UniProtKB/Swiss-Prot annotation:
This is Hydroxymethylpyrimidine/phosphomethylpyrimidine kinase. Catalyzes the phosphorylation of hydroxymethylpyrimidine phosphate (HMP-P) to HMP-PP, and of HMP to HMP-P. Pathway: Cofactor biosynthesis; thiamine diphosphate biosynthesis; 4-amino-2-methyl-5-diphosphomethylpyrimidine from 5-amino-1-(5-phospho-D-ribosyl)imidazole: step 2/3; Cofactor biosynthesis; thiamine diphosphate biosynthesis; 4-amino-2-methyl-5-diphosphomethylpyrimidine from 5-amino-1-(5-phospho-D-ribosyl)imidazole: step 3/3. GO terms for cellular component: cytosol. One of its GO terms (biological process) is thiamine biosynthetic process. The gene is thiD.
Amino acid sequence: MQRINALTIAGTDPSGGAGIQADLKTFSALGAYGCSVITALVAQNTCGVQSVYRIEPDFVAAQLDSVFSDVRIDTTKIGMLAETDIVEAVAERLQRHHVRNVVLDTVMLAKSGDPLLSPSAIETLRVRLLPQVSLITPNLPEAAALLDAPHARTEQEMLAQGRALLAMGCEAVLMKGGHLEDAQSPDWLFTREGEQRFSAPRVNTKNTHGTGCTLSAALAALRPRHRSWGETVNEAKAWLSAALAQADTLEVGKGIGPVHHFHAWW
């Protein structure tokens, strides 16, 4: 079986639970070789974001050229892009290098509520990046921002917004329903072939730092092994649930701790 080379394009997390660090752990845990392009240096920990240093867009583009000119990239995850010019740089390089199997985690806010994408960049992301990617993974506030619409409060409103996002041109949409006030956490997958509901009981832990990053990285790592997004989502969600179930065994930070990416090993 051909080895999988996976790329993450995202910001950093020195505490190791989110961003590039979480993505590379996820790739390794799921048997993919990880490459990375850094868009922002983020001073953050389990308690919140303290500072963000955005990388110059030309240097983001240079990193992408370095990877794509040398390494066969089978799958890509995009996370924090921070600002308009970085979104433009990434969109242009994806087009230039004919990149496939791209999962876009529409990162706008950290778990702590701190902003990770400038408001002006949302339109650029919507117009330049969405039509190029294979799958987007918005939560309900992110979906509302992309659609310039009110936050979905019911599963029916969530369905309507997922269909509207799919119409923007991406191959598939995974709407994450964690913000709904239900005992279970329903997610909906929208593709050109149809719609599929995924639901599981909420894991009883406060340690959920980096779950969005981790899920999108898992989806990217697993996609080349499956025939459909439905199969990919099913395995990625099962793996993430196990990582969440073991999160309390870690002793990381004073705030919202990370999931246990290597729960299968230690």
